[in-house]
Amino acid sequence: MDFCWKREMEGKLAHDHRGMTSPRRICVVTGPVIVGAGPSGLATAACLKERGITSVLLERSNCIASLWQLKTYDRLHLHLPKQFCELPIIPFPGDFPTYPTKQQFIEYLEDYARRFDIKPEFNQTVESAAFDENLGMWRVTSVGEEGTTEYVCRWLVAATGENAEPVVPRFEGMDKFAAAGVVKHTCHYKTGGDFAGKRVLVVGCGNSGMEVCLDLCNFGAQPSLVVRDAVHVLPREMLGTSTFGLSMFLLKWLPIRLVDRFLLVVSRFILGDTTLLGLNRPRLGPLELKNISGKTPVLDVGTLAKIKTGDIKVCSGIRRLKRHEVEFDNGKTERFDAIILATGYKSNVPSWLKENKMFSKKDGFPIQEFPEGWRGECGLYAVGFTKRGISGASMDAKRIAEDIHKCWKQDEQVKKI
């Protein structure tokens, strides 16, 4: 990929009717274009840099890891031990705790970007990306403060990930409640201090919902938790080590169902019978359910103790909302001052990527499941869609960099001939 190739491509684009009719700046990129500067995008850019390949990283926000920096609550820690959340090549600092804080994780990512000299193009919203059959290249249209830019590249990496857009459910009467009280997604929630003395309903019983309830409790709020579906709650640590680390170790030697049975027996010994608290367990074990559906078990950091003491109340699903009131599926009605939606996030790939083979239009995930979903056709790649957190993204980043490097070397050999 040299200067001559770039000039040749610019020559072709000079006679392209799209460039003539559209007031946009055209940028020919010799390396890959990566969409998204979260941990997945940074990991991919770093792995490419290690192999001598420079990429262009497009990020719609004004900072790296915008989900972590702008849309997470203050008390957040990594839910898994740091060794399972490291990006490729550079580990966490040795003096970081087992479960780094939100700010420590951000510092790690910023240092990671500095050490690899990764400088994303910020405030760039990718509106579309499509493969041009005539050019044999991807055309990525991005809108920023200085107008529209079209990036033309051979390789395109979708790194916007699983958590690009908040999932906001609609309940009957939501507008009426919002007119009198507060309704916000966890992406706008920072601290329970904003709700001291308030009656708050938290919708969603995943790790975020559970931890937000605990945070509200610690600041003197009166939280209730909507639990509509069955959920696995495990202690964050068991037998003197992390539950996740112990699970990964046992899976090397035992079948998944036997490991699940072990986890549930130990969890019951430590936490008690969660069904007595209104938290029914799914039929499948926690690890098997994670593999099949991607649904992550909750790692308890103190919320169950508050449920047992009655400081956090467990409620059934919501039927409808009224002004200051919530009617539940069991027919009960209660008053609340605020509702926090801990209802997760979704992929936004279908909104900008114009292709029909690699990504599902339904959920925005690769159609091929892990570990096969990282590579598509025509130089298209995906990172951060494994449903296996940062460790899964790191695995894909390494594969992508190696694959692009292989193509890069082949091109160089052809030119020498």
UniProtKB/Swiss-Prot annotation:
Catalytic activity: indole-3-pyruvate + NADPH + O2 + H(+) = (indol-3-yl)acetate + CO2 + NADP(+) + H2O
Known pathway: Plant hormone metabolism; auxin biosynthesis
Phenotype of null mutants: No visible phenotype, due to the redundancy with the other members of the YUCCA family.
Primary enzyme class: oxidoreductase
Cofactors named for this entry: FAD
Disulfide bonds: none
GO CC entries: cytoplasm
Residues holding FAD: 36-41
Chain sites annotated for binding NADP(+): 204-209
GO biological process: auxin biosynthetic process
Induction trigger: Down-regulated by heat stress. Negatively regulated by SPL.
Tissues of expression: Highly expressed in roots but modestly expressed in the cauline leaves and flowers. Expressed in anthers.
Swiss-Prot/TrEMBL keywords: Auxin biosynthesis, Cytoplasm, FAD, Flavoprotein, Monooxygenase, NADP, Oxidoreductase
Listed GO MF terms: flavin adenine dinucleotide binding; indole-3-pyruvate monooxygenase activity; N,N-dimethylaniline monooxygenase activity; NADP binding
EC number: 1.14.13.168
Function of the molecule: Involved in auxin biosynthesis via the indole-3-pyruvic acid (IPA) pathway. Also able to convert in vitro phenyl pyruvate (PPA) to phenyl acetic acid (PAA). Required for the formation of floral organs and vascular tissues. Belongs to the set of redundant YUCCA genes probably responsible for auxin biosynthesis in shoots.
Identification of the protein by name: Indole-3-pyruvate monooxygenase YUCCA6
Organism annotation: Arabidopsis thaliana (Mouse-ear cress)
Gene: YUC6
